[in-house]
Amino acid sequence: MAKLVNNETTQRAELHRKIWAIADNVRGAVDGWDFKQYILGILFYRFISENITEFFNAAEREAGDLTFNYADISDEEAEKDFRPYTVEDKGFFILPSQLFENVVKNAADNENLNTDLANIFKAIEGSAVGFASEDAIKGLFEDVDTTSNRLGGTVAEKINGYFKRNCRN
């Protein structure tokens, strides 16, 4: 039990450290409310990406594929094999290429990261259209304006800097 509490404390401290590092990186360029909405939206995106990956990985491992990693499969395979039942179970769907971990891997080379993120957020919200979760997912990322010039400099530079410095494991 003590080990679990210590691990949670360590994770919380790491999260606080990352949030302060992000704040230092964009301090002055964004007012507090916009900053909070942006960071919380990105953190939520990371959470649901990790959550859906673990959901698929656990199911595949239970079925006997101990080396399966959803993040490593093609979008086409995900569409065919996973999308049909996922929105019913999870309330949303994210393609492997749209997962936070894959976006981070490619952030340094992606000159369109800000618009790609906006499209990913729209796709996540759109994945619930026609399902019971539609109202809960609709507008979820509307406060995360990745094209806003309030982030200072160029948006792509700010977002790329955020991912490169603050989102690696």
Enumerate the language-model features and the residues they cover.
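Non-catalytic, mostly N-terminal accessory regions of nucleic-acid modification and defense proteins
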Residues: 1-169
